[in-house]
Amino acid sequence: MDGIIPINKERGMTSHDVVAKVRGILRTKKVGHSGTLDPSVDGVLPICVGRATKVVDYLMGFGKVYQGSITLGFSTTTEDLDGEVVETKKLDEPLTDEQINQTLTAMTGTLIQIPPMYSAVKVKGRKLYEYARAGETVERPQRQIKVYDFVQTRPSIFDAEKGQQTIYFKVSCGKGTYVRTLAVDFGRHFGLPAVMSDLSRLASGGFKIEECLTLSDLEQARDEDRLSTVIQPLDRALDNFNTITISDVEWEIVKNGGFLNRPQTDEIIALKYNGNIQALYQYDTNRQNYIPKKMLLVR
């Protein structure tokens, strides 16, 4: 069984929990996910099965879409509601829609972001959250991220008694973007502490929330012997590459990992044979031909 299953992850589950559940439902060990979702976040989590585990990295290269909320007036250790409050600062009056929209627009494009301490980013061989849990501090590397669109989705709510304002947003972003940190950075524009107070992932890996199954849906599909109707071809992970259908002669070369003498069209090409993408080949400027980059060899 090879393919991708877009799962709608429930809140309260880790991404690893979902992988373990899918392994049990499908009775196979070769299962992986393409991008961690925190337990408090729900939404799209593409699950790769069988040979599709070879294309996880390419799924992660697709953009992601989230919707959620930012609350101004306090901050936490984790940049969301799961952490301990470390700073409070009441708002005397709410930000205007003009202020909100101008700042969201200013936070689009190519940005520099410092990942949160409670994250899986590795520094000196250890994950940042391991340092955080041990009470240690470490310099975090700056990373370049891309935010394609960042908009307000409904009127904000101002709680005058608490001195807090909640802003509702939708964001489209590239790989490696921490939405929690976007929330904190939004508050920083106004000299205010902030947290990400809610988040759902609407799209990831080329899949939208409307295409996703719950774990119960997957279990039902198995029981009704219709798994083939819900598992997406691994080709979905390779939509960003130029796909070339190869001849029988070329297939004999490719299936044995040989080089292809083709004029360069793209740096990386996806080779299709017998209706399936069988391999990714990369152009070698020294050899002046295409060489294997990733072998899939789907039957």
Swiss-Prot record:
Known role: Responsible for synthesis of pseudouridine from uracil-55 in the psi GC loop of transfer RNAs.
Active site, renumbered: 38
GO biological process: mRNA pseudouridine synthesis; tRNA pseudouridine synthesis
Top-level division of the source organism's lineage: Bacteria
InterPro entries reported for this sequence: PsdUridine_synth_cat_dom_sf, PsdUridine_synth_N, tRNA_psdUridine_synth_TruB, TruB_C
Keyword field: Isomerase, tRNA processing
One Pfam family from the record: TruB_C_2
Protein biosynthesis is among the record's keywords: no
This protein's encoding gene: truB
MF term (GO), any: tRNA pseudouridine(55) synthase activity
Provenance organism: Pediococcus pentosaceus (strain ATCC 25745 / CCUG 21536 / LMG 10740 / 183-1w)
EC annotation from Swiss-Prot or TrEMBL: 5.4.99.25
Identification of the protein by name: tRNA pseudouridine synthase B
